[in-house]
């Protein structure tokens, strides 16, 4: 693949993997597995112990917007990247990871977001792509997820790290960020 041909490779993956637009969060996705084992939630409901999806970020959908899950969310970069991954845990400092395959540059292919952490991802190179597999445990359900950073979380974290600016928070809440990186 030619450098800068992230859209071409993303389109190949979208077709090969049978992906669709991920509503709300953005990116391209498809459910690929759901555990036959169930777990009981505190409210008495039973859910599959986990589910797993393909997620692709592409130049036309470079951001996976702010969202928070009531489940742990494990992301593994399969191909492409790097990807900036910002986590806002319910307690403790915000952190930023770079998902990639070059450990000498501090990149990691695996990021784990604990339940209750606000998370957002974006391509470091807007012309690149990333293929990520994510496993959520207990399984993802729409009623146990929120999309779009809420005012309380925003006010709690903005400026708490030198890099955690209002502009960054805004960019990660927009499918098509407008600010240069």
Task: Please state what every model-predicted region is.
Residues 135:
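Histidine-centered acyl-transfer/condensation active-site motif
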Residues 1-111, 120-121, 127-128, 138-141, ...:
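Non-catalytic, conserved peripheral segments adjacent to functional cores
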